[in-house]
Amino acid sequence: TYFKIDPEKINASLINYKPSNNRSQVIKTNNNTVIVDCYNANPTSVMAALESFKLVAETNKLVILGDMLELGNISLKEHEKILNFIESNNINCITVGSEFNKVNSNFKNYKTVDLLIEYLKGNKVSSSFILLKGSRAIKLEELINSKSI
């Protein structure tokens, strides 16, 4: 045993580990299953999350994407690439933030998460498999805290 820790205890700890920091958390709400990955977002991490999400064998899927911040002069191009990928893969999507708002797309965009929460009060999302992915400052976790999804 390494560090004199029983391997069974290590195994039990790993099996019972549940992330709680908005990094790939899976949360079951009353209506949906939600992957909460809204601690950080950059083009590489968003594309990796989307590639994995599109492989999930669920029929009613929704991506809620928050802006990728701090991209400087490549921001518009990178946000466009993400939305082009989503559109070409026929993934349902809602975006949050002013960066995604600059992209010409057919997806619903809300400048703030509070505006999206207001929209969802009258437009419930049910029986869905949802990916929340965005930069921390967008505060997508408020969708869980407000019981909007």
Predicted feature descriptions by range:
Residues 1-149:
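ATP-dependent carboxylate-amine ligase
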